[in-house]
Amino acid sequence: MGLSPQLAAVLLCLLVCTGNYARRQDREAGLREIIHNLDQVLKKETPCTEMFVPDVLIATKNTTEKGLLCRATRVLRKFYFPREVTPCLKNNSGVLSILRKLCRSISTLHPQESCSVSTPTLTTLNDFLGRLRGIMQMKNWQG
C-alpha cells in the first residue's frame, strides 16, 4: 500500500515548485525592503549624505552584478565600525540605523565573497545610494 511511482513524481514536482516560489517571494520581499530603506535615506536629505564614499558602482566590462553588490556591501559595512562613523551620522542615528540595515539586507541577498573596493574615485553617499537604488529596482523588475 505504498505510493505509485507516478504519484511520488507528481508530489516531488509540487514540492520543488512550491519551494522555488517561496524563495522567489522571499527574494522579492528583500528587494522591496532594500528599495524602501534606500528611499528613506534619500528623502531625509541630511548633510550626512554629502559625505564621500568610494565610487564602487561603476560597472566595467568584467564586473558582474554580484561583484557590484559585494563592493556596495563593503562600502556600507564601514558604518558598522564606531571609529569610522562620522559625527554627522552619530547625530543622525536614524540614517545610521538604515545604512546598517541596508548592509545586512544586501549581504543576505548576496552572501559575502571576496571583493576589493580600492577605487581612486569618490562619490557622495547620496549619489552612491541613488545608483544602488537603481540597481535594486532593475533586479526587482527582472524577477
Curated annotation (Swiss-Prot):
Signal peptide positions on this chain: 1-19
Glycosylation sites recorded in the entry for this protein: N62, N91
Compartments, as annotated in UniProt: Secreted
Keyword Thylakoid included in the entry's annotation: no
Disulfide bridge map: C48-C88, C70-C115
Main subcellular location: secreted
Keywords of the record: B-cell activation, Cytokine, Disulfide bond, Glycoprotein, Growth factor, Secreted, Signal
Chain segments annotated as coiled-coil in the UniProt record: none
GO terms for cellular component: extracellular space
Top-rank lineage group of the source organism: Eukaryota
Pfam (any one): IL4
Entries under SMART domains matching the protein: IL4_13
Function: Participates in at least several B-cell activation processes as well as of other cell types. It is a costimulator of DNA-synthesis. It induces the expression of class II MHC molecules on resting B-cells. It enhances both secretion and cell surface expression of IgE and IgG1. It also regulates the expression of the low affinity Fc receptor for IgE (CD23) on both lymphocytes and monocytes. Positively regulates IL31RA expression in macrophages. Stimulates autophagy in dendritic cells by interfering with mTORC1 signaling and through the induction of RUFY4.
Name the UniProt record assigns to this protein: Interleukin-4
Gene expressing this chain: IL4
